[in-house]
Amino acid sequence: MKLWLVRHAQPLVDAGVCYGRLDVAADPAATRASAQALAQALPLHAALHTSPLQRCEHLAQSLCALRPDLASKTDDRLAEMDFGSWEGQRWDALGAHALDAWTQDFAHHPPGGGESVNHVMQRVAQALDSTRNSGQDTVWVTHAGVIRATRLLLAGQRQVQHAHEWPTEAVPFGAWEVHGLSR
């Protein structure tokens, strides 16, 4: 059984803006290109789960249009991290005090009053456990934060204590990585 972790295409948002749970669209041409490439790579009848945010839903819809054997199911657990009042703000305008408060208690501090990293880890772990129990090849159309959390979970790490533990490398926009899963 395999899990495809697919990141949405390039969002239509200015560089340097925090847009975790902000429901911004992705570039339509890049979304179509990603769907076309992915449609050729996926096995028949894989389960397709998508974040409820439009930048992921549009990719899943484009993929289903190319692959009638796939049916998209929205899963709120695959949404990007909620940055609360930071959403839509420039990272460099948040101020050192706000960023320091988050990094000093990375596991539990909800940035901008949104969602803590360990809350993200818990909900992604629930989604991963459900996928494992399904016994079916599965595709997640999701976000960089969810993919990073999944990498940690697959490595056996169910919680993050410090900011330096959080992976910095991200799957490129519109790309994916594949992981083998066991029950």
Task: Walk through the language-model features, giving the residues of each.
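Active-site catalytic microenvironments for nucleophilic, acid-base chemistry
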Residues: 62-66, 130, 153-157
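Active-site-proximal alpha-helix that buttresses catalytic centers in soluble enzyme cores
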Residues: 2-67
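Short beta-strand scaffold positions
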Residues: 50-51, 122, 141-142
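Phosphate-handling substructures
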Residues: 66-123
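Generic beta-sheet signal
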Residues: 3-4, 46, 136-145
